[in-house]
Design a protein with these regions (language model features):
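Single transmembrane alpha-helix segments in multi-pass membrane proteins
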Residues: 1-50, 77-87, 91, 229-237
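Membrane-interfacial amphipathic/re-entrant helices at transmembrane-helix boundaries
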Residues: 1-16, 44, 57-59, 85-90, ...
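Inter-helical junctions in multi-pass inner-membrane proteins, predominant
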Residues: 1-12, 155-163, 192-232, 252-269
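Helix-loop-helix "hairpin" substructures at the membrane interface of multi-pass membrane proteins
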Residues: 133-214, 218, 237-243
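Short loop segments and helix-boundary regions at transmembrane helix junctions
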Residues: 26-30, 69-117, 161-163, 219-234, ...
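Transmembrane helix-bundle core of multi-pass membrane transporters
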Residues: 90-161, 260-271, 296-302
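Cytosolic-side transmembrane-helix boundaries in multi-pass membrane proteins
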Residues: 173-180, 184-187, 258-302
């Protein structure tokens, strides 16, 4: 049960850190609204369940697309105008914080409206009762793992087997040179925000099967998302995935171990664990684990 929960949580953190890294690589903006976009996806799944009786697993493609559209709106209406005006990274970062607060306020109002209309709980909810089991193993383990594998396969195919993917990679590695070569860098940025927010929506739909969701959940989980991305190397897609699993598993296992020693009150401080892992990794490998391992391997092979 513990290992099952750790794997599920790691799958979701890996999906979220992957999305965060994609937008950082293409626009150099750390998106502080990423966690709240995921929770918005959770609430979209809840709306589809309450009003249209669509099971959350069936709702995945719908939420995926809707959250992707939210990402396009965030970039097109807020970030692109600022980038065109030559805004610094700090200003863009503050803009994502503002987006986070706007989304958070909207989610709070949305949860009030859902409760008033349906008389069902929306301020706090969980999807565990809608899950299935196979041989005593929760369905969320299979679904989250299958989702992660599917995303990795599709992303690999997109980046390495399509013309648009090659253009996207070129824009990620050197936007100025890509633009000189005639690549529409703006289009790749819009797509990256769509993809990033879609991944957040996917993770957000699955998250209520793992834990209770409240409007502020995104503000808590963003700590783990950023820790995973930075630990792996903020500009590395492979690092984001590796960091997601490292942070997810260590946070789950360490929280469980500490709760056995100090009691359940320690759960209030669970986010100290990913932050501690982040500090340790940055002290040993400032550029992230993936780049750090490459340097160590190169050093010992001399």
């Amino acid at each position: 049960m513990l290992l099952e929960g750790a794997i599920v949580y790691s799958n979701l953190i890996a999906l979220l850190s992957l999305g965060l890294t994609i937008t950082y690589i293409t626009t150099s903006v750390p998106n502080f609204a990423h966690g709240t976009i995921a929770v918005f996806g959770s609430y979209l799944a809840l709306i589809l369940l309450y009003f249209l009786n669509i099971h959350p697993y069936i709702a995945i493609p719908i939420v995926f697309l809707l959250c992707g559209l939210i990402g396009i709106l965030c970039y097109s209406l807020v970030l692109r105008p600022l980038i065109k005006r030559g805004a610094s990274v700090v200003i863009l970062m503050i803009a994502t914080l503002a987006l986070d607060l706007i989304l958070l306020g909207f989610i709070g109002s949305l949860s009030d409206a859902i409760e008033e209309i349906t008389s069902k709980s929306a301020k706090k909810f969980i999807f565990a009762i809608y899950d299935f089991e196979i041989s005593g193993i929760s369905g969320i383990l299979f679904v989250s793992t299958a989702s992660m594998i599917s995303i990795l396969v599709l992303l690999w195919f997109l980046l390495f087997k399509t013309k648009f993917g090659i253009a996207l990679r070129a824009s990620m590695e050197n936007p100025a040179l890509a633009e000189v070569m005639g690549i529409d860098v703006e289009k790749t940025r819009i797509f990256s925000w769509f993809l990033s927010s879609s991944l957040a929506g996917l993770a957000g739909t699955l998250l209520p099967f793992k834990q209770e969701i409240v409007p502020l959940t995104g503000s808590l989980i963003i700590v783990s998302i950023f820790s995973a991305s930075i630990v792996g190397g903020l500009a590395s897609i492979a690092g984001a995935i590796f960091g997601g699993y490292l942070i997810g598993i260590s946070e789950s296992l360490a929280t469980y171990g500490l709760s056995m020693i100090f009691g359940s009150e320690i759960l209030l401080y669970s986010k100290v664990i990913p932050l501690t892992a982040l500090v340790i990794v940055l002290l040993l490998m400032p550029q992230g684990i993936v780049e750090g391992l490459r340097k160590w391997i190169k050093f010992f092979s001399i």
